[in-house]
Amino acid sequence: MVIKLGGVLLDSEEALERLFTALVTYREKHERPLVIMHGGGCLVDDLMKKLALPVVKKNGLRVTPADQIDIITGALAGTANKTLLAWAVKHDINAVGLCLGDGNTVSVTPLDAALGHVGKAEAGSPALVQTLLAANYMPIISSIGITKDGSLMNVNADQAATALAATLGADLILLSDVSGILDGKGQRIAEMTAQKAEQLIAQGIITDGMVVKVNAALDAARSLGRPVDIASWRHADQLPALFNGVPIGTRILA
């Protein structure tokens, strides 16, 4: 099972406490191994503000010029990754902090020259992660990738999680601030097909970063040939059930 963490989760001690408590509860009761995938957009935005650097997004993806990729790598593969690792240590979970490039776990190529150092993620080699899981470690993987020519790349974490799930043949959960996809009245949609998603995007109900999230989930469901869950980390008591396959947010159907 791949669990992708997003939103302000990394900024909130209360949220991290809830999440890691749920992870401990799950691991005590269930055998299926977990892999954590994370971005850290809020953290990067804060850092950019402190350094007075512009934040530019194009179709929900962060434009990453050559003079910013080192900073973004430091925030995601450094601060965000090691913060999550620290929480795992605090909760007695044996974890290992990685990026997409470790063991070529996720293969990354440049996505679009106009976006700069932004990578496209595709399935890579499962060997390293499988070795760690077999030894009972929980991998925590940041969305920084490395191309074949050694360039660092910022990868959208939803898309990275999809490629990671494809690499491992695993189920995927996209955890964020929202309890799923909402309709025009703010009500949670329990199940979503590609047709329904296209309709809501055309109507302007699904917008901005949520378009990227929904498209990533649809791509994942199609490429994995299995449903993908979008859910909120806020419902901590429901998380162990979610990690065991019970939908609590929006289930994206292939």
From Swiss-Prot:
InterPro entries: AceGlu_kinase-like_sf, AcgluKinase_fam, ArgB, Asp/Glu/Uridylate_kinase, NAGK-NC. Keywords: Amino-acid biosynthesis, Arginine biosynthesis, ATP-binding, Cytoplasm, Kinase, Nucleotide-binding, Transferase. One of its GO terms (cellular component) is cytoplasm. ATP binds at residues 177-182, 205-207. NCBIfam families: argB. Homodimer. This is Acetylglutamate kinase. It comes from Yersinia enterocolitica serotype O:8 / biotype 1B (strain NCTC 13174 / 8081).
